[in-house]
């Protein structure tokens, strides 16, 4: 008998659990949302978001631009970064710009963690939207108290590229109001 690896088993378990929750509360879900394909798509998008946020604070993170479509846009407050090169610029990993001073080195911290909560993911075939709350936590040195440094909302749109979900737009915003023109 062939055994599934830990990752395969976890993935199948997550799909099964999501399906069980969906079936257990049918009044909260539309028929379209209950389709197995949509449940899997939502789980894949949630996995993409989780892996993206787990990159923060890691010594050797995955390339942030790999989470985005080629023509994607990252919006941080009033600053817009377009395409994969622009996104790499946003994270200080792109080629140096002639008109910009060099970025200071990242601060050394004992722990930097970003958590994600309340994800609302809506799939529309080959596109999707997600909104969520993120919270940044820092411990400067071992033994120091935990500090919440930032909390805000992310509004993202997604597209399927070669069978994989990628960010099309990712907007980080404070406050309670969604971005102008936002649609689930």
Describe the function of each predicted region.
Residues 28-58, 62, 66-70:
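Short, low-complexity N-terminal intrinsically disordered segments enriched in polar/charged residues
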Residues 61-134:
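A solvent-exposed, acidic/Ser-Thr-rich amphipathic alpha-helical stretch
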Residues 1-15:
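Bacterial N-terminal signal peptides that target proteins for export
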Residues 127-131, 151-182:
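Short beta-strand edge/turn micro-motifs at domain boundaries
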Residues 114-116, 149-154:
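Short, surface-exposed coil-to-beta transition loops
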């Amino acid at each position: 008998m062939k055994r599934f690896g830990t990752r395969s088993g976890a993935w199948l378990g997550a799909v099964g659990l999501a399906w069980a929750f969906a079936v257990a509360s049918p009044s909260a879900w539309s028929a379209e949302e209950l389709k197995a394909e949509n449940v899997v798509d939502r789980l894949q998008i949630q996995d993409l978001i989780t892996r993206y946020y787990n990159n923060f604070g890691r010594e050797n993170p995955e390339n942030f631009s790999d989470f985005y479509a080629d023509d994607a846009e990252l919006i941080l407050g009033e600053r817009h970064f377009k395409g994969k090169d622009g996104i790499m610029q946003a994270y200080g990993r792109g080629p140096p710009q002639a008109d910009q001073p060099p970025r200071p080195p990242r601060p050394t911290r004992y722990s930097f963690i970003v958590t994600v909560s309340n994800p609302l993911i809506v799939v529309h075939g080959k596109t999707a939207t997600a909104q969520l709350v993120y919270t940044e936590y820092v411990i400067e040195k071992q033994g120091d108290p935990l500090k919440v440094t930032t909390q805000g909302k992310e509004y993202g749109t997604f597209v399927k590229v070669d069978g994989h979900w990628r960010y099309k737009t990712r907007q980080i915003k404070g406050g309670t109001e969604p971005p102008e023109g936002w649609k689930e």
